[in-house]
UniProtKB/Swiss-Prot annotation:
The modification Phosphoserine is found at residues 114, 394, 397, 422, 433, 550, 693, 707, 724, 752, 839, 987, 1008, 1143, 1189, 1191, 1211, 1217-1218, 1280, 1328, 1336, 1342, 1387, 1423, 1457, 1524, 1542. This is Breast cancer type 1 susceptibility protein homolog. Its EC number is 2.3.2.27. Heterodimer with BARD1. Part of the BRCA1-associated genome surveillance complex (BASC), which contains BRCA1, MSH2, MSH6, MLH1, ATM, BLM, PMS2 and the MRE11-RAD50-NBN protein (MRN) complex. This association could be a dynamic process changing throughout the cell cycle and within subnuclear domains. Component of the BRCA1-A complex, at least composed of BRCA1, BARD1, UIMC1/RAP80, ABRAXAS1, BRCC3/BRCC36, BABAM2 and BABAM1/NBA1. Interacts (via the BRCT domains) with ABRAXAS1 (phosphorylated form); this is important for recruitment to sites of DNA damage. Pathway: Protein modification; protein ubiquitination. Residues 318-334, 1042-1059, 1373-1397, 1445-1470, 1607-1618 have a biased composition (Polar residues).
Length: 1863
C-alpha cells in the first residue's frame, strides 16, 4: 500500500504541480477561459475582466505590473486545452484512485452544478461568496446568512433540511468559524477549505437525506453547539457574527453532524454540534479559519483584495461539491455515519462541553450521551443508516431529519457508549453497514479539506499556531481523547476490516483509518472525518499547531487519559495502534481538534492560522501522501499513534515530544522566525508552540526525557515534521515510533519514511518557507526537537531512533527532501517577500509538483525549476545548509555525545539564528532544514546535498561546533553561505544539486537526501569519527559518503575545498580561501567549523558513529557517504590527513551520495546483507540512470562547478600549489610508478584511471589519509585484481568485468570508488599534494580541473559510475545501456564549452589511440592478457576519459559513450573523472591517466614512476599501461597487502587508522562495505566489482595506499608526504605486489573460473547479481565473451526467458544459460547452488521446454552449423552483424563476408542469411539468390536453430527468390 500510495502521491504531486502551474494567479484556481496578456501571463477571463473593470484606463498585470487592457487580452486555447486535459487527468485520477483530488476544486466547481452538489453546496456554498465571502464574514451581514439561508434553505429543503434557516439562525454565531473556512483565499487554501467545505458538503449531503435528522442533530447539535459556542465563544464570538451566514449552513452541518461539530469543538470549532457540516468545514475551516479567525478576517479581506477569495470560495465550493459528490456517492453512508458521527461528535462535544463548560445547552446531548443508551442508539443509528440510505436515495425528507433527531440523540448515546466501549460493536456495525462510503466520504472530505487547507496555507502562507488552552484542551482532550481513543481503540479493534476496506477503497486518500473510525463511530466516524478533516485541516492548517497542539493535545490527552482513563485509553489506544492506529486517527483528530479548539480557545487564531497554514502545507503534502498513502487516516493514526500509538507512547510522545517539540520548536521557531516572512508566521507558531510548551511545560519537560523522546523523537518529530502531512506519516511514523520503541524503527520509519519523505518533503517545503512552522514542524521540529529536545530530554536513544527514522526515512525523505529542496529553493527564491505565503505556496506547489519538478527539471533543464530544484538558489543552499545541519544534528543525535553537543549547538544555533534572524532567515531555513533533517536526514540531506548541503553542513557544524560559530557562521557564513557560497553553491550546488536533483528525480531524491544526511551527519559524525576508531569506521563510511557528498555534492565548491582541506587544516582554510570566499565560507563552515566541530564533535561523533553504524550501517554508508565531506573537512581540519583519509574513505561510498535512490535500493539490499555495497550499487545504478538523464544538468552544473572548481582549485592553489607544483614531480614520480602500473591498470585503466582520477584525487587526499586510502587502495587493488580477473573475460569480459567490477565497484566503490571518484579526485589532489604521489601528476593536470572537473567529474563520475552501474545493469537489461551511458555522458559533455569539447575530442582521439596501444600491450602484457585487453580498452577509455577532463565532457561523453558502449559502466564512472582529471592537461592527462593507473598499483607506480615519467612525457599511456597491467596485478597484490597493511597503517595513522580500522584492513573507501563485509573475500569481491571501477582505481588505490601509509606519515607533513608517499608508495606497492601476486592470481583464477553476463535484468536485479558475483569473486561483465561462463537470464518460474542476443550467444557458446533465480537462491542459501537446477529450459518463441541451452552445453563438440558456409547479408536489427556472425561461428559454421566469397564445391553448404524486415528496399533480398547459388533464409533460421541448438530445416525459412531479370 505504501508503494501504491507513494505512486499515487507522486502522481498527485505531479497533478498538483500541473494544477499549480495552470492556476490563475488572481483567483488561484485552474484557469477558466484563459486569456493571455501581452506580457504573456495567463489569467482567467473573468478575473482579468473583473480586474480591468475595477478602474478605468489601463490596469496593471498582477504579475509583472505592465499595463494591460481588454484589447490586449487574447484567448489562450492552448491553456484551455491544458486545463481541460488536466481536469480529465484529475478526474481519471480520482476515478482510478478513489481519492478526492486535493486540488480538484476545478472539478468540484463543475461538480458544484450537480443538483446534489448544489444542495449540499448550498448550505456550504452559501458560505459563500468568493471574495465577498471574507467581507461577509467580516461584516457578518445577514446577506450571507440570507444567502445561505436561501441557498441553504433550497438545498436544505431539497436535502430535507427544513430547519436550515432555524439552524442557521441558531448556529449562525457558531457558524462564523465555519465560514471562516470559506475565507480561504489561496487555491490551496481553497483546496484545503474545499476539503473542509467538502466535509461540510458531505455532511450537507449527509444532511440532505437526513434533513430531519439534521434538524434533530441540529437540536442536539445546537445544544452542543451552544455549549461549544459558549466555550468557543471567546474564540469565535467575533467570528460568529462574521460567520453567521456560514454558521447557518454550518450549523446545519453541525446539527446534522454533531460529530463534525465535535471535531469542530475539539478543534475549537466553536460550539457547533450541528457543525457536522459546520464542523467539517467549521472544524477545518475553523481550524484554519477559527485559527485564522482574526487572520481569516484580515486575510479574507486581504484575500478578497487579492481577489483570491473568489477563487477560494469557488475552489471551496468546488471542493465542497467534490466532497458533496463524494458524499452524494456515499450519501447514505455519509448521512448515516454523520448522524452517528454527529452523535459521536455531539457526545464528544458534549463530553467536552461538560468537561470544559458543563454548559447544559446540550442537555439533550448530555442526556443522549448516556453510555447506557449508546448500544440502542447505535442500533437505531444502524437502522437509521439503512433508512438514511433510503432517505438519501429517496429524498432529503424531514423524516430523515426527525429520524435524524432521534438518531442524533441515539448517536449521542452511541457516541457516549462508543466512547465507553459499550457501543463499539454497534458502531462497528454502523461502520460495517457503511464502511466504505463513509470512509470514502470522510477520506475524500478530509483529503479535500486538507488539500484545501494546504492550498490555502501554501498560497497564503498561513501559519496556524495553536496556543491551545492546553489545560482546557487537556480536559477536553482527556474526555474526548479518552472517549475518542477508547472509542477509537474499540472502533479500531472492531473495524479493522472496515479500515482496511476504507483503505482499499481509498488507498490513496489518507483518510481510511479515520474514515473507518468515523464510520465505526458513527459519531467517531464523523468526528474522525471531521476531526480528521479538522486534524487534516489542523494538521494542514496547523501542522505545527497540530504538532504542538497535537503534541500538547496528546500530552493533554495522554495526561488526561492517564489521569482519567489513561490506562484503559492508553491500552485501547495501544491496541488501536496495534490494530493500526485506526482509532488513533480519531484520537488524533479529536486531539488535534481539541488542540485546535483549545488553541482556538486560547487565542490561537492567528497562531493557529499560521500554524494551520504551515500545517496546511504539511497537510497538503501529507494529503498528497495521505491521498496516496491513505494519509489522512494514517496521518490521524499517526497523530494518534503519536498520541495513541500506545497511549503511553502517545502521552510520552506527544507529551514529551510536544514538550520537546515545543521547546525545540520554540527554538526552531526562534531560529526560524528569524527567516524572513517565516518570521511572521513563526512568531505565531513559536508563540503557539511556546504556548503549547508553556501550557504543557510540565508535560513537555516531563515527557521529553521520557520514552516518548525515544518514540516521539522519531515519531513525534516526524509527526511534527508532518503533523498533517504526517498524519498518515505519523501513523507510520508513530508506528515507526512504536517500532522505534520496539526497535522496529527502521522498517516502520522506512514506511513512514516514504510518507515522511513526501510529507516532510512538503513539510520541509512548507517548513522551508515556513521553516519555523513547517520545517520546525516537519524537519526542523524533528531536528531541533531531536537535537534540542534530545539535549534537553537527554534521549540519545531517541536520537538514535530519530536517526533511524531519519535514515529509514531517507528513501522516502529523499522525495521529500528533493521536493523540499525545490520547495525551499522556490521558497527561497522569494524567501522574505511573501516567504510564508510563497513558501507555503511553493511548498504545496513543490509538493504537488514533486514529480512535476522532476519532469520540469528534466524538461526545462536550466529553467527556474532547475534552480529551485537544484538549490541553485542562494536560499536553497541555505536550506540545504539547514538540511545539512539537521542531518548533522541527526547524526549527532544518533550519537548521544554528538547529540547533546549537536543539540546544544543546534539550540545555540537556534538561539543565534534567532539573534541572526534577518541574516539567518534563509540560513535558518537551512539550519532548520538541517535540524529537521536530523530526524529525516535524507530529506534534509537532499536539500543539503542539493546545494547548501555542504554549507548546511558547515553551518550546522558551525552551530554544532559552537554557539559562537553558529551565529557567526549562520550570520556570517550563512550569509556568505547565502550569498557567496550560494554562488559557489550554485555552481557547486548546481553541479551537485543538478546531479542530485536529476538523480533525485530519478531516484526520488533518494540519493541527495541520504547523501546530504550522510554529509551532514558526517560532518559532526565524521569529524568525531576521525577521532575514534568506531567513528573511524563510520567515518570511513560516513566520510566516504560525506566526502562524496561534499566532494560529490559540493564537489566543486566544498568538495574542492575538502580536497584542499584534505592536506591540512591550514590547507583547508587556505584552500577555502583559494576556492573562493563562498567556497572558503563553505569550507570554513565545513572545514574550519568542522575542525571545531571535529574537536567538539569528535567524542560526540564517536558515540554517534557507532550508533549510526549500528542503526544504519547501510545508511551509514549512505549517511557516511553522504556525510563524509563534512567529516572530511572536519577531519581535514582537525587532522588534515585523517580528514583526507576520511574523505577518501568517504569517497569510497559516493554511491550513497551518488545514488540515494539507489541507496533506497541499497536499503532494500542492505536488508539482504548487501547493505553497503548493495546500497552503493543500488545508488550507483539509480544514480547512473539519474546521471544519464540529469547528466546534462549535472554536467552543466558539473561543468560550471568544474570550471568554478578549477578556478577554486587554482585559487585555492596555495594548498594545491604544492600539490600542483609537486604534482608534476609526483606525476613524474607517480608516472614513473604509473608507467609500471598502467599496463596492469590499463585494463581497468579506463575505469581504474577514471576512477583513479577520482581515486587519485581522492587518493591524493587518501595518501594524506594514507591508511584510509591504503585500505581503499587495498580494496581497490583487490577490486582491481578481481576486476582484472573479472576483466579476464577478455575485451568484453574484461571490459564488462570492468564494468561489472565497476558496477561492483560502484556498489562497493560507490561507497568506495564513487566517493572515491568524487572524493578521490579531491583527495587525490590533496594526496598528490600532500603525498606527492605520482597520482599528483594526474591531479596536477586535473587538480585544478579535478577540483573543478574533478569535482565535476566526481559528480559526473558519481553519476557516471552510478549510471554506469545502472547502465551496466541496464546494459544487461538492454544492450543499449552503453548508448544510454554515452548519451548521458554526451549530454553531460554538452554542457562543456566548445573549447573543452574540442580539447576532449582531441584527447579522446589520442586516448583512443593510446587505448588501442594499451589494449595491445595489455593483451601481450599482464597476467590477464585477455582480461587485460578488455581492461585496457576499458582502461584506455577510462584513461582517455581521465586524459580528457579538459577535453570536454563532450569528449568524455563521446569517450564515455564509446567506452560505455564498449564498457558502459567501466568507462563512464572513471571515464568521467578521468576525463575531467585528464582534461586539466593533455600531457597531464596522459599522466593523470597513468597516475590513475599508478594509483592502481602502488608498487608499479614506483617502478612505473620513472617509466611513467617517460611515458608521461611521451604521453604514451600504452607504455605506462603495460607496466600498469603488471602493476595492476602487482597493485592488486599491493593492494591486498595494503589492505592488510592499511589496517596497521590506519592504526599507525590516527586519522587514517580510524577509517581503516573502521573498515578493517580493506580499503575503506572502496572497501568500506567490501572490507567491512568481507575483508578478504568481500574486499576481493568488492574489489572485483570495484575492479572495473577500481580497475583504475585499484591502481589508484594501491598507489595511494602505499603512499597513504606514508601519507599517513606524510599527511602529517604534506610536503614531505609527497616524497615520502612516493617512496612509500613504491616500496609499499612493491611489497604489496610481491605479496599480492597470489591474490591476483587467485582472483584471476576465480574470475577465470566464472564470468557472468546478465540479460534482461533490472538494475536492482543486476545489483543483486553484482553482489552475488562479488561475493563469490565471479567476473561480472556487460558483454558476453569467450571467457564468459554463465549467462544469467531473466526468466519466469519455469525458467522460460525472452530471447536476447546474450541468450543466443550463450547457447551458441555452450555456456551456462541460467535463470536469475540461481543468483537469488544462491544468495538466500548463502552458497553457490548448482546451475543445473536453474538452467533455462526454453524461451517464449521456440518453446518453454526445448532444453536448447542444456543441449548446447552438453554437446560442445557437436556444432549444429558444422559444414555450413553462412553469409550474413544485409542489414540486421537488434543485433550487430558481427555478433550474428560470431553466433554462427560458435555453432560451427564458417562465416563468409561477401556473397562472392562462397567456396563452392568444397563440401561446405552455402547459406545466405538475411532479415527481410530490415531491408529498406522491398525486394532487394529476393534477388540475392541470383547473385550466388545459395539458399536464402531468414535470420529466424539461425536464431531458432541456436535457441533449440538443433539445425532447423531450411524450407520453413527460405525466402522466395525472384529471377534476376525481374529484380
Amino acid at each position: 500500500m505504501d508503494l501504491s500510495a507513494v505512486r499515487v502521491e507522486e502522481v498527485q504531486n505531479v497533478i498538483n504541480a500541473m494544477q499549480k502551474i495552470l492556476e490563475c494567479p488572481i483567483c488561484l484556481e485552474l484557469i477558466k477561459e484563459p486569456v493571455s496578456t501581452k506580457c504573456d501571463h495567463i489569467f482567467c477571463r473573468f478575473c482579468m475582466l473583473k480586474l480591468l473593470n475595477q478602474k478605468k484606463g489601463p490596469s496593471q498585470c498582477p504579475l509583472c505590473k505592465n499595463d494591460i487592457t481588454k484589447r490586449s487580452l487574447q484567448e489562450s486555447t492552448r491553456f484551455s486545452q491544458l486545463v481541460e486535459e488536466l481536469l480529465k487527468i484529475i478526474h481519471a485520477f480520482q476515478l482510478d484512485t478513489g481519492l478526492q483530488f486535493a486540488n480538484s476544486y476545478n472539478f468540484a466547481k463543475k461538480e458544484n452544478h450537480s443538483p446534489e452538489h448544489l444542495k449540499d453546496e448550498v448550505s456550504i456554498i452559501q458560505s459563500m461568496g468568493y471574495r465577498n465571502r471574507a467581507k461577509r464574514l467580516l461584516q457578518s451581514e445577514p446577506e450571507n446568512p440570507s444567502l445561505q439561508e436561501t441557498s441553504l434553505s433550497v438545498p436544505l429543503s431539497n436535502l430535507g433540511i427544513v430547519r436550515t434557516l432555524r439552524t442557521k439562525q441558531q448556529i449562525q454565531p457558531q457558524k462564523k468559524s465555519v465560514y471562516i473556512e470559506l475565507g480561504s483565499d489561496s487555491s490551496e487554501d481553497t483546496v484545503n477549505k474545499a476539503t473542509y467545505c467538502s466535509v461540510g458538503d458531505q455532511e450537507l449531503l449527509q444532511i440532505t437525506p437526513q434533513g430531519t435528522r439534521d434538524e434533530t442533530s441540529l437540536d442536539s447539535a445546537k445544544k452542543a453547539a451552544c455549549e461549544f459556542s459558549e466555550k468557543d465563544i471567546t474564540n469565535t464570538e467575533h467570528h460568529q457574527s462574521s460567520n453567521n451566514d456560514l454558521n447557518t449552513t454550518e450549523k446545519h452541518a453541525t446539527e446534522r453532524h454533531p460529530e463534525k461539530y465535535q471535531g469542530s469543538s475539539v478543534s475549537n470549532l466553536h460550539v457547533e454540534p450541528c457543525g457536522t457540516n459546520t464542523h467539517a468545514s467549521s472544524l477545518q475551516h475553523e481550524n484554519s479559519l477559527l485559527l485564522t479567525k482574526d487572520r481569516m478576517n484580515v486575510e479574507k479581506a486581504e484575500f478578497c483584495n487579492k481577489s483570491k477569495q473568489p477563487g477560494l470560495a469557488r475552489s471551496q465550493h468546488n471542493r465542497w461539491t467534490g466532497s458533496k459528490e463524494t458524499c452524494n456517492d456515499r450519501q447514505t453512508p455519509s448521512t448515516e455515519k454523520k448522524v452517528d458521527l454527529n452523535a459521536n461528535a455531539l457526545y464528544e462535544r458534549k463530553e467536552w462541553n461538560k468537561q470544559k463548560l458543563p454548559c447544559s445547552e446540550n442537555p439533550r446531548d448530555a442526556e443522549d450521551v448516556p453510555w447506557i443508551t449508546l448500544n440502542s442508539s447505535i442500533q437505531k443509528v444502524n437502522e437509521w443508516f439503512s433508512r438514511s440510505d433510503e432517505l438519501l436515495s429517496s429524498d432529503d425528507s424531514h423524516d430523515g431529519g426527525s429520524e435524524s433527531n432521534a438518531k442524533v440523540a441515539d448517536v449521542l448515546d452511541v457516541l457516549n457508549e462508543v466512547d465507553e466501549y459499550s457501543g463499539s460493536s454497534e458502531k462497528i456495525d454502523l461502520l460495517a453497514s457503511d464502511p466504505h462510503e463513509p470512509l470514502i466520504c470522510k477520506s475524500e472530505r478530509v483529503h479535500s479539506s486538507s488539500v484545501e487547507s494546504n492550498i490555502k496555507d501554501k498560497i497564503f502562507g498561513k501559519t496556524y499556531r495553536r496556543k491551545a488552552n492546553l489545560p482546557n484542551l487537556s480536559h477536553v482532550t482527556e474526555n474526548l481523547i479518552i472517549g475518542a481513543l477508547v472509542t477509537e481503540s474499540q472502533i479500531m479493534q472492531e473495524r479493522p476490516l472496515t479500515n482496511k476496506l476504507k483503505r482499499k477503497r481509498r488507498t490513496t486518500s489518507g483518510l481510511h483509518p479515520e474514515d473507518f473510525i468515523k464510520k465505526a463511530d458513527l459519531a467517531v466516524q464523523k468526528t474522525p472525518e471531521i476531526i480528521n478533516q479538522g486534524t487534516n485541516q489542523m494538521e494542514q492548517n496547523g501542522q505545527v499547531m497540530n504538532i504542538t497542539n497535537s503534541a500538547h493535545e496528546n500530552k493533554t490527552k495522554g495526561d488526561s487519559i492517564q489521569n482519567e482513563k489513561n490506562p484503559n485509553a492508553i491500552e485501547s489506544l495501544e491496541e488501536e495502534s496495534a490494530f493500526k492506529t485506526k482509532a488513533e486517527p480519531i484520537s488524533s483528530s479529536i486531539n488535534n481538534m481539541e488542540l485546535e479548539l483549545n488553541i482556538h480557545n486560547s487565542k490561537a487564531p492567528k497562531k493557529n492560522r499560521l500554524r494551520r497554514k504551515s500545517s496546511t502545507r504539511h497537510i497538503h503534502a501529507l494529503e498528497l501522501v495521505v491521498s496516496r498513502n491513505l494519509s489522512p487516516p494514517n496521518c490521524t493514526e499517526l497523530q494518534i499513534d503519536s498520541c495513541s500509538s500506545s497511549e503511553e507512547i502517545k502521552k510520552k510522545n506527544y507529551n514529551q515530544m510536544p514538550v520537546r517539540h515545543s521547546r525545540n520548536l520554540q527554538l526552531m521557531e526562534d531560529k526560524e522566525s528569524a527567516t524572513g516572512a517565516k518570521k511572521s508566521n513563526k512568531p505565531n507558531e513559536q508563540t503557539s508552540k511556546r504556548h503549547a510548551s508553556d501550557t504543557f511545560p510540565e508535560l513537555k519537560l516531563t515527557k521529553v526525557p521520557g520514552s516518548f523522546t525515544n518514540c516521539s523523537n522519531t515519531s513525534e518529530l516526524k509527526e511534527f515534521v508532518n503533523p498533517s502531512l504526517s498524519r498518515e506519516e505519523k501513523e507510520e511514523k508513530l508506528e515507526t515510533v512504536k517500532v522505534s520503541n520496539n526497535a522496529k524503527d527502521p522498517k516502520d520509519l522506512m514506511l513512514s519514511g516514504e510518507r515522511v519523505l513526501q510529507t516532510e518533503r512538503s513539510v520541509e517545503s512548507s517548513s522551508i518557507s515556513l521553516v519555523p512552522d513547517t520545517d520546525y514542524g516537519t524537519q526542523e521540529s524533528i531536528s531541533l526537537l531531536e537535537v534540542s529536545t534530545l539535549g534537553k530530554a537527554k534521549t540519545e536513544r531517541n536520537k538514535c531512533m530519530s536517526q533511524c527514522a531519519a535514515f529509514e526515512n531517507p528513501k522516502e525523505l529523499i522525495h521529500g527532501c528533493s521536493e523540499d529542496t525545490r520547495n525551499d529553493t522556490e521558497g527561497f527564491k522569494y524567501p522574505l517577500g511573501s516567504e510564508v505565503n510563497h513558501s507555503q505556496e511553493t511548498s504545496i506547489e513543490i509538493e504537488e509538483s514533486e514529480l512535476d519538478t522532476q519532469y520540469l527539471q528534466n524538461t526545462f533543464k536550466v529553467s527556474k525549476r532547475q534552480s529551485f530544484a537544484l538549490f541553485s538558489n542562494p536560499g536553497n543552499p541555505e536550506e540545504e545548509c539547514a538540511t545539512f545541519s539537521a542531518h548533522s544534528r541527526s547524526l549527532k543525535k544518533q550519537s548521544p555525545k554528538v547529540t547533546s553537543e549537536c543539540e546544544q549547538k543546534e539550540e545555540n544555533q537556534g538561539k543565534k539564528e534567532s539573534n541572526i534572524k534577518p541574516v539567518q532567515t534563509v540560513n535558518i531555513t537551512a539550519g532548520f532544514s538541517v535540524v529537521c533533517q536530523k530526524d529525516k536526514p535524507v530529506d534534509n540531506a537532499k536539500c543539503s546535498i542539493k546545494g547548501g548541503s555542504r554549507f548546511c553542513l558547515s553551518s550546522q557544524f558551525r552551530g554544532n561546533e559552537t554557539g559562537l560559530i553558529t551565529p557567526n557562521k549562520h550570520g556570517l557564513l550563512q550569509n556568505p553561505y547565502h550569498i557567496p557560497p550560494l554562488f559557489p553553491v550554485k555552481s557547486f550546488v548546481k553541479t551537485k544539486c543538478n546531479k542530485n536533483l536529476l538523480e533525485e528525480n530519478s531516484e526520488e531524491h533518494s540519493v541527495s537526501p541520504e547523501r546530504a544526511v550522510g554529509n551532514e551527519n558526517i560532518i559532526p559524525s565524521t569529524v568525531s569519527t576521525i577521532s575514534h576508531n568506531n567513528i573511524r569506521e563510520n567515518a570511513f563510511k560516513e566520510a566516504s559518503s560525506s566526502n562524496i557528498n561534499e566532494v560529490g555534492s559540493s564537489t566543486n565548491e566544498v568538495g574542492s575545498s575538502i580536497n584542499e582541506v584534505g592536506p591540512s587544516d591550514e590547507n583547508i582554510q587556505a584552500e577555502l580561501g583559494r576556492n573562493r570566499g563562498p567556497k572558503l565560507n563553505a569550507v570554513l563552515r565545513l572545514g574550519l567549523l568542522q575542525p571545531e566541530v571535529c574537536k567538539q564533535s569528535l567524542p560526540i561523533s564517536n558515540c554517534k558513529h557507532p550508533e549510526i553504524k549500528k542503526q544504519e550501517h547501510e545508511e551509514l554508508v549512505q549517511t557516511v557517504n553522504t556525510d563524509f565531506s563534512p567529516c572530511l573537512i572536519s577531519d581535514n581540519l582537525e587532522q588534515p590527513m585523517g580528514s583526507s583519509h576520511a574523505s577518501e574513505v568517504c569517497s569510497e561510498t559516493p554511491d550513497d551520495l551518488l545514488d540515494d535512490g539507489e541507496i533506497k535500493e541499497d536499503t532494500s539490499f542492505a536488508a539482504n546483507d548487501i547493505k553497503e555495497s548493495s546500497a552503493v550499487f543500488s545508488k550507483s545504478i539509480q544514480r547512473g540512470e539519474l546521471s544519464r538523464s540529469p547528466s546534462p544538468f549535472t554536467h552543466t552544473h558539473l561543468a560550471q562547478g568544474y570550471q568554478k572548481e578549477a578556478k577554486k582549485l587554482e585559487s585555492s592553489e596555495e594548498n594545491l600549489s604544492s600539490e600542483d607544483e609537486e604534482l608534476p614531480c609526483f606525476q613524474h614520480l607517480l608516472f614513473g610508478k604509473v608507467s609500471n602500473i598502467p599496463s596492469q591498470t590499463t585494463r581497468h585503466s579506463t575505469v581504474a584511471t577514471e576512477c583513479l582520477s577520482k581515486n587519485t584525487e581522492e587518493n591524493l587526499l587518501s595518501l594524506k589519509n594514507s591508511l584510509t586510502d591504503c585500505s581503499n587502495q587495498v580494496i581497490l587493488a583487490k577490486a582491481s585484481q578481481e576486476h582484472h580477473l573479472s576483466e579476464e573475460t577478455k575485451c568484453s569480459g574484461s571490459l564488462f568485468s570492468s564494468q561489472c567490477s565497476e558496477l561492483e565497484d560502484l556498489t562497493a566503490n560507490t561507497n568506495t570508488q564513487d566517493p572515491f571518484l568524487i572524493g578521490s579526485s579531491k583527495r587525490m589532489r590533496h594526496q598528490s599534494e600532500s603525498q606527492g604521489v605520482g597520482l599528483s601528476d594526474k591531479e596536477l593536470v586535473s587538480d585544478d580541473e579535478e577540483r573543478g572537473t574533478g569535482l565535476e567529474e566526481d559528480n559526473q563520475e558519481e553519476q557516471s559510475v552510478d549510471s554506469n552501474l545502472g547502465e551496466a545493469a541496464s546494459g544487461y537489461e538492454s544492450e543499449t545501456s552503453v548508448s544510454e551511458d554515452c548519451s548521458r555522458l554526451s549530454s553531460q559533455s554538452e554542457i562543456l564549452t566548445t573549447q573543452q569539447r574540442d580539447t576532449m575530442q582531441d584527447n579522446l582521439i589520442k586516448l583512443q589511440q593510446e587505448m588501442a596501444e594499451l589494449e595491445a600491450v595489455l593483451e601481450q602484457h599482464g597476467s590477464q592478457p585477455s582480461n587485460s585487453y578488455p581492461s585496457i580498452i576499458t582502461d584506455s577509455s577510462a584513461l582517455e576519459d581521465l586524459r580528457n577532463p579538459e577535453q570536454s565532457t563532450s569528449e568524455k561523453a563521446v569517450l564515455t559513450s564509446q567506452k560505455s558502449s564498449e564498457y558502459p559502466i567501466n568507462q563512464n564512472p572513471e571515464g568521467l573523472s578521468a576525463d575531467k582529471f585528464e582534461v586539466s592537461a593533455d600531457s597531464s592527462t596522459s599522466k593523470n591517466k597513468e597516475p590513475g593507473v599508478e594509483r592502481s598499483s602502488p608498487s608499479k607506480c614506483q617502478s612505473l614512476e620513472d617509466r611513467w615519467y617517460v611515458h608521461s612525457s611521451s604521453g604514451s599511456l600504452q607504455n605506462g599501461n603495460y607496466p600498469s597491467q603488471e602493476e595492476l596485478i602487482k597493485v592488486v597484490d599491493v593492494e591486498t597487502q595494503q589492505l592488510e597493511k592499511s589496517g596497521p597503517h590506519d592504526l599507525m595513522e590516527p586519522s587514517y587508522l580510524p577509517r581503516q580500522d573502521l573498515d578493517g584492513t580493506p580499503y575503506l573507501e572502496s572497501g568500506i562495505s567490501l572490507f567491512s563485509d568481507d575483508p578478504e573475500s568481500d574486499p576481493s569481491e568488492d574489489r572485483a566489482p570495484e575492479s572495473a571501477h577500481v580497475g583504475s582505481i585499484p591502481s589508484s588505490t594501491s598507489a595511494l595506499k602505499v603512499p597513504q601509509w606514508q601519507v599517513a606519515e606524510s599527511a602529517q607533513s604534506p610536503a614531505a608526504a609527497h616524497n615520502t608517499n612516493t617512496a612509500g608508495y613504491n616500496a609499499m606497492e612493491e611489497s604489496v605486489s610481491r605479496e599480492n601476486p597470489k591474490l591476483t592470481a587467485s582472483t584471476e583464477r576465480v574470475n577465470k573460473r566464472m564470468s557472468l553476463v546478465v540479460s534482461g535484468l533490472t538494475p536492482e536485479e543486476f545489483m543483486l547479481v553484482y553482489k552475488f558475483a562479488r561475493r563469490y569473486h565471479i567476473a561480472l561483465t556487460n558483454l558476453i565473451s569467450e571467457e564468459t561462463t554463465h549467462v544469467v537470464m531473466k526468466t519466469d518460474a519455469e525458467f522460460v526467458c525472452e530471447r536476447t542476443l546474450k541468450y543466443f550467444l550463450g547457447i551458441a557458446g555452450g555456456k551456462w544459460v541460467v535463470s536469475y533465480f540461481w543468483v537469488t537462491q544462491s544468495i538466500k542459501e548463502r552458497k553457490m547452488l548448482n546451475e543445473h537446477d536453474f538452467e533455462v529450459r526454453g524461451d517464449v518463441v521456440n518453446g518453454r521446454n526445448h532444453q536448447g541451452p542444456k543441449r548446447a552445453r552438453e554437446s560442445p563438440d557437436r556444432k549444429i552449423f558444422r559444414g555450413l558456409e553462412i553469409c550474413c547479408y544485409g542489414p540486421f536489427t537488434n543485433m550487430p552483424t558481427d555478433q550474428l556472425e560470431w553466433m554462427v561461428q560458435l555453432c560451427g559454421a564458417s562465416v563468409v563476408k561477401e556473397l562472392s566469397s562462397f567456396t563452392l564445391g568444397t563440401g561446405f553448404h552455402p547459406i545466405v542469411v538475411v532479415q527481410p524486415d530490415a531491408w529498406t528496399e522491398d525486394n532487394g533480398f529476393h534477388a540475392i539468390g541470383q547473385m550466388c547459388e545459395a539458399p536464402v533464409v531468414t535470420r529466424e533460421w539461425v536464431l531458432d536453430s541456436v535457441a533449440l541448438y538443433q539445425c532447423q530445416e531450411l524450407d520453413t525459412y527460405l525466402i522466395p527468390q525472384i529471377p534476376h531479370s525481374h529484380y
